[in-house]
């Protein structure tokens, strides 16, 4: 699977988790879904920051530099929102639900920009290299999923 397809698949999984949170009936289900969502977001950001964004920068440094810088800023905003949510996650109340809604909006904004801008720039890498990059992303994602995310969102690398 090429890198952009793998990342789009992740985007869909995150959208699904936001929908699951919204439809969950019990607080326990909502908190479990939040933990899954948190892990997905942190791992997704790590594989982009460690592997995907550097490759996109190499493909077209001038165009990609601004795009990647903005994406990294958005990642940092999401991480800060996760830290806030981590502090609230002892109970699901209106503030927690509203913060999840804001997180969903921020993530969706980031996804749209990434898919419409960065992925277009990434096409300059070429199909074969995107396939190889996708393999590297999947391998790193598998490593991180197996290890689990036990760090707070703020300390996750950028």
Indicate where each model-derived feature is located.
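Small-residue-biased structural context
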Residues: 1-158
